[in-house]
Design a protein with these regions (language model features):
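Conserved alpha/beta enzyme-core scaffold
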Residues: 1-499
């Protein structure tokens, strides 16, 4: 059957107030752009007439300016899940304007399938090719596309010529069965393929194909600096030492690395350390640094959910697919982030913390315990199931006025039971096999900034010793309270809490 070509505005007009929309993509890579931008215009026009217009948004992870940005400013989002990075969306969430469900990325597709979030009315899927028989070839990300395509009543395809058809075949599309029929996911090494290179849909559900030429709205990250370079080197030195001790096999293990300049610095340091053999990635996001290391032969294979790279880097991949075809695979997020596979492969996870407390609990989502930053993303998927779980962060922020090492985190995302290693520019705290009191000593000695060490030791004295996990409950968030009061955690006075 022939597919109906329509404009982005025509496609957006088919979406009604109250609909739930499923979107392709994972980060700005591979996400819808043209239709959501037109949908924001409709919302603004309806609001100007005094009429309501809001939709629910289901995605694989964050999107880009032409989705989360424009829709947030148009006040067109009623509900959204999961992770996001857009500043306008963040502002709306923290103002209480959007209901935001910050769940683990590996759970998103299955929770939609289980019916936890309601019906999917329309799926908007970016593709580099779509056939009359309903084969949709995704662009730079897998996300939750297989699930939302199957569940949606209707599908709109954004056929984006900014993505070369040479990328066809990069995806490995696999959707597990739901309980009680689910079987093991048969991936035993990062390069295994178990599915199809396309998403198969009923072509009768495709109500329109929108032709676009719209590059991904990828973010670039700050270049490495002495601080991030030191953190990266500390990570590389730690992993090399663990390999020398025989804790990590001599062949090394697959890595997962988060997003951002610290993650890039870590990968750069690992690439330079020739005591670490060429390795594989089983991760959620591939950034420019990974592509560079693949070209250099330092990374043998990269399995991920998305190619979150700059547009010139992506063009280079498309132009060199003969080289990359057997070195990259893109998967749906419930496979790239599958706890089952992460544990089977022995993935080493490296993620970024906002703050870490003395016992190894990590806050990776909330500023001051209440204001959402971005979300938990896939860090929980990997941390709890990793062979070794690592969290990195600078020891201080805001010109030293904020310590990343605190007595008690203001929001818990990753518990002390899941965090193995904490690394700052100051050093490495190995928490494996340690009691809470031993963990506190390791974190203060090795990770805290010198300006805060005495303050943290004094807190432990105030907390006393007659407990499994010592805390002075009345003072546990004292450094956060002082930051709110004076703007500098260093001004904390424990004597105020000892009365």
């Amino acid at each position: 059957m022939s597919l109906n070509r329509i404009s982005a505005a025509e496609a957006a007009s088919l979406i009604k107030h109250g609909y739930n929309i499923g979107l392709s993509g994972f980060t700005p890579a591979g996400t819808a752009k043209a239709v959501t931008a037109e949908l924001a215009k409709i919302a603004e026009a309806e609001h100007a007439k005094g009429k309501p217009f809001q939709v629910g948004i289901f995605t694989g992870a964050s999107t880009g300016e032409s989705c989360d940005g424009v829709l947030s400013r148009a006040k067109a989002i009623r509900y959204r899940a999961p992770y996001t990075t857009n500043s306008d969306f963040r502002k709306a969430v923290n103002n209480g304007e959007i209901a935001y469900n910050d769940i683990h990325l590996s759970q998103m597709a299955q929770e939609v399938r289980y019916g936890f979030m309601g019906k999917v009315n329309v799926a908007i899927i970016e593709a580099c090719e779509v056939t009359p028989g309903g084969k949709i070839y995704l662009t730079a990300a897998g996300g939750i596309s297989p699930t939302i395509c199957r569940l949606a009543d209707q599908i709109i395809v954004e056929l984006n010529s900014a993505h070369s058809k040479s990328g066809m075949g990069m995806h490995d599309v696999y959707e597990p069965l739901d309980p009680p029929y689910r079987r093991e996911i048969p991936i035993y090494k990062p390069s295994d393929r178990i599915g199809l290179p396309y998403v198969q849909v009923d072509p009768k559900k495709i109500i329109g194909v929108v032709e676009t030429n719209w590059p991904d709205e990828a973010r670039s990250f700050a270049a490495a600096d002495p601080l991030t370079d030191k953190i990266g080197q500390n990570v590389a030195d730690f992993l090399a030492a663990d390999m020398k001790r025989g804790i990590i096999p001599s062949t090394f293990l697959p890595l997962q690395s988060g997003v951002g300049n610290i993650a890039n610095a870590v990968l750069g340091a690992l690439g330079r350390d020739k005591t670490i053999p060429p390795f594989e990635m089983y991760t959620e996001v591939i950034q420019n640094s990974v592509i560079g290391l693949i070209r250099e032969g330092r990374i043998k294979f990269g399995s991920a959910c998305s190619l979150t790279v700059t547009n010139d880097c992506l063009e280079g991949i498309y132009n060199d697919m003969d080289f990359f075809r057997d070195k990259l695979v893109l998967r749906p997020s419930e496979i790239s982030n599958s706890p089952e596979i992460i544990r089977r492969l022995g993935v080493i996870s490296i993620n970024t913390a906002i703050e870490v407390d003395l016992y190894g609990n990590v806050n990776s989502t909330h500023i001051g315990g209440t204001k959402m930053m971005n979300g938990i993303g896939g860090s929980g998927d990997f941390t709890r199931n990793a062979y070794i779980s690592i969290f990195t962060c600078p020891s201080v922020a805001k010109e030293g006025k904020i310590s990343a090492i605190v007595p008690m985190v203001s929001h818990h995302d990753h518990t002390e039971h899941d965090v193995n290693i904490v690394i700052t520019e100051q050093g490495v705290a190995d928490l494996r096999g340690k009691s809470p009191k031993e963990r506190a000593q390791a974190i203060i000695e090795n990770c805290a900034h010198p300006d805060y060490k005495e303050l943290l030791w004094d807190y432990l004295k105030l907390a006393g010793n007659r407990a499994q996990t010592p805390h002075a409950i009345q003072a546990a968030l004292g450094m956060h309270a002082e930051l709110a009061k004076s703007g500098d955690m260093k001004n904390t006075n424990w004597a105020e809490y000892a009365k």
